[in-house]
Structures are given as C-alpha cells and as structure tokens.
Amino acid sequence: MMVDPNGNESSATYFILIGLPGLEEAQFWLAFPLCSLYLIAVLGNLTIIYIVRTEHSLHEPMYIFLCMLSGIDILISTSSMPKMLAIFWFNSTTIQFDACLLQMFAIHSLSGMESTVLLAMAFDRYVAICHPLRHATVLTLPRVTKIGVAAVVRGAALMAPLPVFIKQLPFCRSNILSHSYCLHQDVMKLACDDIRVNVVYGLIVIISAIGLDSLLISFSYLLILKTVLGLTREAQAKAFGTCVSHVCAVFIFYVPFIGLSMVHRFSKRRDSPLPVILANIYLLVPPVLNPIVYGVKTKEIRQRILRLFHVATHASEP
C-alpha cells in the first residue's frame, strides 16, 4: 500500500527510477556502452553453455557448474538491463509497484543462487585436488543436478520474504528511487514506517548466504593449498591452473557485492551516484568477465572456441 504525505491512502502504485543521480544528461550516451556490455555478456555466456553442451568431453561437474553460472549470469543481467536502457534511452522512468518487487526478488535471489554455485565449484575443486580418487563417486551427475536444484531453492527461499516485508510497508515520503532498478535496500528506505525487520533480515541473509559461502570457499582453498604444497612442482602448476578461473570468478562476484552492500548500508547520501555505479558493476561485470576468464584460462573451452571461429571463418569464405 502507498499513502500520501498526509497519511491518506494514495492511488499511486508505482516508483520512479531516475537512473544515475547527477548524471541524467549523460545517461543517453552511457546506455550505448552498457548495452554493448550486456550483449557481450549474453553472447559470451550462451557460447559457454553451447560449448559445454555439445562437447561430450566437457560433461564433467566443473563444466556443468560453469553452465549453471552462465545461465544465472544471463538471467541476472537481463533482470535489470532492459529497464535500465528504457530509462536511459526513452525516459521510461516509472515501474509498477509489483513489477518493482518482482525485479527486486529476481536480482537478489539470482545473486544468492550464483553464490551457491560458486561454493559448489569450490567444493568440486577441493574434491578433485584433495581426494582425486573419490571425485567421480562423490560428484556424480545426479548429485550435481541436486546441487543445482538446491542452489535455486536456497536463493529463492532466502529472498522470498524481502518483497513480502516491503509489501507490508506504507510509503508516504516519496516514490522516487535514485537508482536504475529496484533493490531491497533502496525501496525500504522510502517507507514511512519502522523498517527494522527489513534491515535485520537483510543482514541475516547477507551473513547466512554470502558471508557463509565466502568463508566456506576460503576454507576450501586453504585445504587445497595445504594439499598442493605437498605435490611436485609440475603437479602444483597443474592444480593451480585448474583453480585460477574459479578464483577469478569468486573475486569478480564477491568484491563488487560486498562493496555495494557496504555502501548501501552505511552511505548517508541518497543522491550519490556511487551506489548506483557499483550496482551496475555488480550486475554487469561478472556476466561479462566470467566467460572471458574461463575462455582464456580453461584450455578445453579455449580450444573449442577457437575451433568454432575456425569453422565460421571457413564457412564464410567463397
């Protein structure tokens, strides 16, 4: 429900997204590089999914998890970019209240799913390096599928209360969001009622999901490092080589996320463009960089991509 400043019920059931505060005049031109990054992200992640699906030798847990990561990256960037581009190019700044809640749920739940998949990938590397003889029996295809389903259920279940809590709040101050899309931290600050439940639950989610996942990933790599240090130099190089891409993906996801969360929680200036810029980085950079990192650092994927380009080049020749 939304109410007017006098406390009466209002017919307004929408929010206004202003895009990048302080950069309104530049938004039209900024949309072009953002659109290019979005297209690169979608194309890159679709390429990863296609390669893993069509290359039988890549039907292993690590690459199946990579496909899950690519699918989530496509969805998380698509949940925000079309509306953002509509704001920047067509000044379509309004978003219906329920649509805002749906977008909020999509962005936050997909982020939770991505964190879970990154944790699963760390577990895969731990088993492959520390217990190589048990890898095939521990991470079977049915078990990998169950982990993927668990990632979806966990992300959705943790974030489902957020729109429910927001739905209960009255909004009598303003319906203007200094942002390009709807995030829980921004919407709850517009409420004219006590938001402690939203704040506390938001912190619980960050600690129990993102915080716990990052700690478990760090712990798994400590165990991996302990095992690798006892190997020969050649074996060390091979083991580290299989982990580089995942470590990069972890940093690409968690560093912007933690930075964004800290700025949102502790920033006093609502009109500052910093949280919005960080949010755009958080939702666009991982989907763009993950396929590049895995394409460059993973030999099997790199060779398959080069083969695709080779076939496409010869097919275009007269």
From Swiss-Prot:
Main location, first listed in the record: membrane
Keyword annotations from UniProtKB, A to Z: Cell membrane, Disulfide bond, G-protein coupled receptor, Glycoprotein, Membrane, Olfaction, Receptor, Sensory transduction, Transducer, Transmembrane, Transmembrane helix
Domain of life of the native organism: Eukaryota
PROSITE patterns: G_PROTEIN_RECEP_F1_1 (PS00237), G_PROTEIN_RECEP_F1_2 (PS50262)
Organ and tissue specificity: Highly expressed in prostate. Very low levels may be detected in some other tissues, such as placenta, skeletal muscle, heart, ovary and testis. Up-regulated in prostate cancers.
Extracellular topological intervals: 1-31, 82-100, 167-198, 261-275
InterPro entries for this protein: GPCR_Rhodpsn, GPCR_Rhodpsn_7TM, Olfact_rcpt, OR51/52/56-like
Biological role stated in the UniProt entry: Odorant receptor.
Record protein name field: Olfactory receptor 51E1
